Structures are given as structure tokens and as C-alpha cells.
């Protein structure tokens, strides 16, 4: 079954326009950029707005490919060749499953490698953290915060008795893209000091193609209210069949007929029956079930 005709995909809420200006203002005083991308969509999650700003202000960049546990080693090698060769940026692979200390050490090492040690002993390096919504930016920030607590404290201390302030300013995370608005800078290294300043996740005013838009929707970067789950299933099925990745069939307990025909509607109806859903919302429930399994990596590692 051929993929359904797709409408033009756009998602650029008003707060993102303001956030773009915030990022540019902060970039003037930052010495480096840490860009978080989703490793499953390493090219589609490139934001041309970030590219233009990094070039204009000539800032060194470390690209953190998050959710790297969901892509193969062969794909990681291709990602490194492209990003380091075409975008002149260092690449670091990570996932929320990693130990926070490991991420802190790797990231601070890469930032210092790109910027050099600060000129003054008591100075530090400030890096701006940017990325599209829902690429795991807030999860990484919070993981780094927890790693800093385990490491024996932070710059957020009260004077006198040395008691730590209660940490209430934590980056919110969730399945809703574009949730993060603002969090304070965090320190991820000492001697020399390295600070990260988080920023809101932003999209671009115009997505270059429907293919890119659908890939971003599959990864959860564009919310379901913009691209319904039922619209994603035909696109995902086409990608998996074209890549000869049939792991989804066993994960969803599907008959061979669906693999042979590529019928997305039959796929959703079969899954709905398998998970005990019926009625008018059965296909939607099935589509959400399929997307949840894909995003967890139950269908294998592929881009």
C-alpha cells in the first residue's frame, strides 16, 4: 500500500520566536555551543537557525546525539563522518541510561578541547545548550544536575553554614514537545569551571520537506496534535519495509499478509485486536501503541 498523501507540516508556536531571540542574546556571551539532537534523526533534527547563529558568532560546537542506544554502531560511524566533516563540530553520543558522571566528564572534556582553558584561574567556560523540542535536552540537563550533587555539591550554596539550597529550578520533562521554558546555569566541571546554560527548545518556522516533518513527528519532536499518530503509521511502515527491517512484525505479533501488502490500515486494525481495543477509537489506540513501541526501540535500531 502506498504511503498516504501528506499535508504540509508546520509547528512554530509564538513562544519559540521569542526563544530564538533569547538564544541569540545568550550566545553573544557564551564561549561554546552544546547542541542536543536525537540520534535517530541526526539530520532531520538539524535546526538551520542554530546553524546560522553558530556561523555568525563563530562559536565552537559539541553536538550531543542523545538516545544513541536506539541506533546501530554503523549508523553512529556515518553520523560522525557527516557532522565532523560537513559541520565542523565534535560529536558525543549519549543516552539517559548512561551514568551522569560519565556524561559530565565527556561533555566538559569536549567543551574544553574546543575552547581551551579559561584565561583567568577563577574564570570559567560558559556553553549554551540548544536543541529542538523533545530531543532529550531537559533529561540530560537534569542528569547532569544529579551528577553534580553526587560529586559533592555545586555553585548553588548558601554562605555561613554551607547548607545547600533546596533545588527547585529543575528542567521539566515529559512527552509534550516544547515544554522547557527556562532553567538556571549549572556547573559540570571544576578547575577549570564549565557551566551550561539551558535554553527553550525551538523548531524552525518552515520545515524544509514533509519527509523531514514526518521523521521529526516519528521521533516525538513534533507533537501528535500537529501530526496524528494514525498519520505516522503508514510512513513508519514504509520506512521499515524499505529498510528490510521486519522486527516490528514479531514485536507486534503480525501475520505475514501485512508485511507482504504494506497495508497500514490492516496493521492498525490487527494491532487494535491484539491489544483488545475496539470501537471508534481503536485505530488511534493501535497507532499510539505502535508509536510507543517504535520510540522505545522495540522494532530494532535504524534511522
Language model regions located:
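A short acidic Gly-Thr/Ser loop motif
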Residues: 133-134, 200
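Glycine-rich, N-terminal phosphate-binding loop of Rossmann-like dinucleotide-binding domains
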Residues: 37
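Helix-rich effector regions associated with P-loop NTPase G domains
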Residues: 2-32, 40-41, 46-48, 52-62, ...
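Canonical P-loop GTPase G-domain recognition
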Residues: 59-62, 68-132, 145-158, 275, ...
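Conserved lysine of the Walker
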Residues: 137
Amino acid at each position: 500500500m502506498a504511503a498516504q498523501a501528506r499535508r504540509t507540516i508546520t509547528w512554530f508556536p509564538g513562544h519559540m520566536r521569542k526563544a530564538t531571540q533569547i538564544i541569540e542574546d545568550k550566545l553573544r556571551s557564551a564561549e561554546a555551543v552544546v547542541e542536543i539532537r536525537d540520534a535517530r534523526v541526526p539530520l532531520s533534527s538539524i535546526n538551520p537557525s542554530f546553524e546560522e547563529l553558530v556561523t555568525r558568532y563563530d562559536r565552537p560546537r559539541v553536538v550531543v546525539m542523545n538516545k544513541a542506544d536506539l541506533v546501530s554502531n554503523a549508523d553512529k560511524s556515518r553520523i560522525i563522518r557527516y557532522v565532523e566533516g560537513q559541520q565542523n563540530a565534535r560529536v558525543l553520543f549519549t543516552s539517559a541510561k548512561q551514568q551522569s558522571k560519565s556524561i559530565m566528564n565527556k561533555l566538559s572534556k569536549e567543551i574544553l578541547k574546543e575552547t581551551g582553558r579559561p584565561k583567568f584561574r577563577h574564570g570559567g567556560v560558559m556553553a549554551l545548550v540548544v536543541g529542538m523540542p523533545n530531543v532529550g535536552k531537559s533529561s540530560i540537563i537534569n542528569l547532569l544536575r544529579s551528577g553534580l550533587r553526587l560529586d559533592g555539591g555545586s555553585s548553588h550554596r548558601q554562605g555561613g553554614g554551607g547548607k545547600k539550597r533546596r533545588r527547585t529550578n529543575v528542567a521539566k520533562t515529559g512527552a509534550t514537545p516544547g515544554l522547557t521554558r527556562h532553567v538556571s546555569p549549572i556547573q559540570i566541571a571544576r578547575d577549570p569551571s564549565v557551566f551550561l546554560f539551558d535554553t527553550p527548545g525551538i523548531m524552525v518556522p518552515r520545515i524544509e520537506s514533509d519527509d523531514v516533518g514526518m521523521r521529526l513527528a516519528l521521533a516525538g519532536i513534533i507533537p501528535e496534535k500537529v501530526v496524528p499518530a494514525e498519520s505516522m503509521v503508514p510512513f513508519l511502515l514504509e520506512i521499515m519495509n524499505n529498510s528490510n527491517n521486519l522486527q516490528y512484525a514479531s514485536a507486534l505479533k503480525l501475520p505475514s499478509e501485512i508485511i507482504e501488502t504494506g497495508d497500514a490500515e490492516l496493521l492498525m486494525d490487527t494491532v487494535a485486536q491484539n491489544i483488545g481495543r475496539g470501537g471508534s477509537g481503536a485505530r488511534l489506540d493501535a497507532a499510539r501503541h505502535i508509536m510507543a513501541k517504535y520510540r522505545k526501540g522495540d522494532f530494532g535500531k535504524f534511522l
